[in-house]
């Protein structure tokens, strides 16, 4: 009798964390495209997600299923610009504060540059999973405890990058599914 067994790539892959961490730390230019689902006690919505990081500058674009802009956010170390779905432009110096003030949604924008790629920079605690990549991290930001659970990774990328993660704080839950990574 002959046969073959196949394993999912997530199970068969294992990385060396110090090497993975070093490679992630060197990523200064990348783009992630996928989907975002947001849920709390008051609202729920889904959006197409496009995140770009270029050194310390970030660009977040959320669009609906028709491709219409919901939010466009550009951050630099010194300034933040948010454009809403009506085309109104807002400026500030703190991305999380500006998003919260205009949408009512709390997001740890400043930490997402690293957390999105599975780098636990500035996290209070983190744990590696069986594949040797970050499976969980947590960070206290003011009175809020933010937790990121990494569900799946794309091991075809080098370094391996998250493809599904859940960010939560209290009753807020944000599911991120990354369909495409572009490392520049």
Where are these regions (language model features)?
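Amphipathic hydrophobic-ligand
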Residues: 43-47, 71-74, 145-147, 173-175
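Flexible, processing/modification-adjacent segments and terminal tails
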Residues: 86-140, 144
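An acidic-aromatic
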Residues: 57-106
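Glycine-centered tight beta-turn/hairpin loop motif at sheet-sheet or coil-to-beta transitions
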Residues: 42, 66, 85-87, 141-145, ...
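Gly/Pro-enriched, hydrophobic low-complexity segments
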Residues: 118-184
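Bacterial Sec signal peptide processing site at the extreme N-terminus
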Residues: 2-21
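Beta-strand-dominated lipid-handling architectures at cellular/organellar boundaries
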Residues: 33, 52, 72-74, 79, ...
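Post-signal-peptide N-terminal segment of Sec-exported extracytoplasmic proteins
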Residues: 23-59, 63-64, 70
């Amino acid at each position: 009798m002959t046969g073959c067994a196949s394993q999912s790539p997530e199970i068969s892959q294992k990385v060396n964390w110090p090497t993975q961490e070093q490679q992630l730390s060197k990523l200064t230019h990348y783009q992630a495209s996928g989907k975002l689902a947001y849920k709390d006690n008051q609202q729920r919505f889904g959006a197409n997600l496009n995140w770009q990081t270029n050194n310390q500058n970030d660009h977040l674009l959320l669009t609906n299923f028709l491709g219409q802009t919901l939010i466009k956010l550009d951050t630099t170390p010194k300034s933040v610009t948010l454009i809403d779905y009506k085309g109104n432009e807002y400026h500030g110096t703190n991305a999380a504060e500006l998003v919260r003030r205009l949408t009512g949604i709390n997001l740890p924008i400043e930490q997402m540059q690293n957390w999105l790629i599975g780098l636990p920079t500035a996290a209070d605690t983190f744990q590696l999973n069986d594949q040797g990549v970050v499976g969980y991290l947590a960070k206290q930001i003011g009175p809020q405890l933010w937790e990121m659970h990494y569900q799946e990774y794309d091991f075809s990328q080098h370094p391996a990058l998250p493809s599904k993660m859940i960010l939560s704080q209290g009753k807020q839950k944000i599911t991120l599914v990354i369909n495409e990574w572009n490392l520049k």
